[in-house]
Amino acid sequence: MTQSLTIRRPDDWHLHLRDGAMLAAVLPETARHFARAIVMPNLVPPVVTGAQAAAYRDRILATLPKGMNFEPLMTLYLTEQTDPDDLAAAHTSGLITSVKLYPAGATTNSASGVKDFDKVRPVLERMAEIGCPLCVHGEVTDREIDIFDREAVFIDRVLDPIRRATPGLRVIMEHITTKDGADYVAANPEGLGATITVQHLMFDRNDMLVGGMRPHYYCLPILKRRHHREALVAAATSGDARYFLGTDSAPHPTHAKEAECCAAGCFTAPIALSCLAHVFEEAGALDKLEGFTSLNGPAFYGLPVNADTITLSKADPLDIPKTLPAGEHTVTVFDPGVPLHWRVTR
């Protein structure tokens, strides 16, 4: 039985760092284990220009504790007013790594997102020309569509037409939550990848709802049925390089999560790798963990893998802190619901 596993240092291909006191609180939790992360641009106001991306990157680097080695990979928030020239300049210079598409109203701070996809077609065409990837929050927001069906409908109504109209565009389906999403990636070998979160590999909607509502498991896209979770585990542990880790670790003050109308997001960064080792061990696929966390993402983005390594060791259950101080507030750490025996030891 494997008791120790050394892998290339991982990257997180979907991360929320926030800003200000929250940024200062959560950044070390990612930088401790991850070398790079795709940083989400849905601040208030959102990061919509190259200048704003540069300023946000500078704030992140200024906040990074001394001695920690971490590279934020910046993104732009796509709007119907996005300037293709500004976007192209930011990407060509290496300032941004990708562009994020939020359908308006789909998730936290997405009000500035896209309503009319025809209005962003010229931008998408420019992105295809310059090789800038598009990260997609894949849900429709029509009120008549059930929240549990929004991903599948998005694939049919929005994503597939976008990809057919812009065949050179490289697309990342972020935080896929359904068998539909996993199957769509599997059926489209060129220019399409997908990130998968910790919570969607560990839990289904019963874990969130049965016996009482657990707000710290509430995220968007929402947890789905068990067979969808099983399909995600199969995809993540398959060794297929089109699937890679994007934690979507999304911190909110505890009072905003434990509220009558609670915020969406799970703060998984402190224990993400321990959770993943548990999932992959349960699936008999520890040998595939390095690909999912450390190799597949760089391959899709055309970036080098990290030179350094980390070691995960199996021992007595990990002592998981319940909360993390964040300025005047606290952030509740994701509860895995089971003892975690794997931890990063070096």
Swiss-Prot record:
Its cofactor is Zn(2+). Zn(2+) 2 binds at residues 100, 137, 175. Pathway: Pyrimidine metabolism; UMP biosynthesis via de novo pathway; (S)-dihydroorotate from bicarbonate: step 3/3. This is Dihydroorotase. Keywords: Hydrolase, Metal-binding, Pyrimidine biosynthesis, Zinc. GO terms for biological process: 'de novo' pyrimidine nucleobase biosynthetic process; 'de novo' UMP biosynthetic process. Substrate binds at residues 16-18, 42, 137, 220, 252, 264.
